[in-house]
């Protein structure tokens, strides 16, 4: 595995080899000051970007461009390599776009947070089940050129949370955001929202419709640990069986009354609010 700054591929900074279990040692890389990711008015990019070139005998090479490194935070880059196919020689290249708090993405189109589920002919689960896998459509719903990916539910949540918030934020802020992401996702699963519209996927990667998921992006350890702790949970209201479609926005470029705001949840976490207190602050006391 060779590591270089994204945009300067010829300058290899580190070369590492995986051990018998397929893991590398921890590599220290430069990143901007941690404060940049804690200040919503900071215009500078709060993470550095690296390109990883991964090669193994008998497997197709993979290049990941734009792996994000935040200060004082362990980043984890999971890679699954495919065995070499003699008919194909080119390497797989994944370009990781900007983090949603830094880049420009379309804001969420508002929806009802509780879906009608008594219409005829709908397939709806009788109880809330945490799925093992979900199918992610990597584009907007009607983009038939976008690829569908089978993703483990836990890995999906870790990817979305790593794309939507910064892992440097307070742990209870991360918990509140992870709960909102999981509840939103489980609402899509429980109501079979897209399948009932004739699509063959669970959720999309478009921020206008759902939340950001990025193929092969790195995740961050503080987020990963919290998802492992909470992954069977979701948010509900009294006398409502389905998980609530907990919508949110960044709260800086986009404002969204009655939804969680990501930057606002960070300051509540800094003030000592618990995860459920953060969520009730935005979604109301019966959450």
Placement of each model-derived feature along the sequence:
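Short, acidic Ser/Thr/Gly-rich low-complexity loop/linker segments typical of extracellular
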Residues: 8-38
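Short, solvent-exposed coil/turn segments
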Residues: 11, 19, 47, 72-74
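Conserved, single-site charged/polar hotspot
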Residues: 17, 27-29, 53-67, 71-287
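Conserved aromatic beta-strand anchor motif in extracellular beta-sandwich/beta-rich domains
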Residues: 3-5
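A short, solvent-exposed beta-strand micro-motif common in secreted/extracellular proteins
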Residues: 34-58
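Generic short beta-strand
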Residues: 1, 14-15, 51-52
């Amino acid at each position: 595995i060779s590591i270089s700054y994204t945009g300067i591929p010829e300058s290899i900074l580190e070369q590492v080899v995986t051990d018998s279990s397929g893991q590398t040692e921890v590599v220290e890389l430069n990143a901007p000051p941690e404060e940049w990711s804690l200040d919503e008015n900071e215009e500078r990019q709060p993470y550095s970007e690296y390109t990883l070139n991964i090669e193994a005998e008998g497997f197709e090479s993979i290049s990941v461009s734009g792996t994000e490194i935040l200060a004082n935070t362990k980043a984890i880059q999971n890679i699954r390599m495919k065995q070499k196919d003699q008919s194909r020689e080119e390497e797989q290249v994944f370009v990781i776009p900007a983090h949603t708090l830094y880049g420009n993405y379309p804001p969420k189109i508002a929806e009802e947070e509780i879906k009608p589920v008594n219409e005829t002919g709908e397939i709806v689960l009788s109880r809330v089940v945490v799925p093992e896998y979900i199918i992610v459509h990597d584009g907007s719903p009607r983009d038939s050129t976008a690829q569908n990916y089978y993703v483990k539910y836990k890995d999906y949540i870790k990817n979305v949370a790593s794309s939507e918030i910064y892992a440097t934020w307070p742990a209870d802020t991360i918990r509140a955001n992870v709960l909102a992401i999981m509840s939103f996702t489980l609402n899509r699963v429980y109501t079979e929202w897209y399948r009932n519209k004739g699509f063959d996927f669970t959720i999309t990667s478009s921020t206008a419709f759902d939340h950001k998921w990025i193929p092969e992006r790195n995740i961050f350890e503080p987020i990963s640990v919290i998802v492992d702790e909470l992954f069977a949970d979701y948010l509900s209201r009294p006398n409502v069986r389905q998980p609530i479609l907990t919508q949110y926005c960044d709260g800086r470029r986009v404002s969204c009354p009655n939804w969680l705001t990501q930057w606002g949840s960070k300051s509540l976490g800094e003030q000592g609010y618990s995860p459920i207190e953060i969520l009730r602050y935005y979604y109301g006391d019966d959450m």
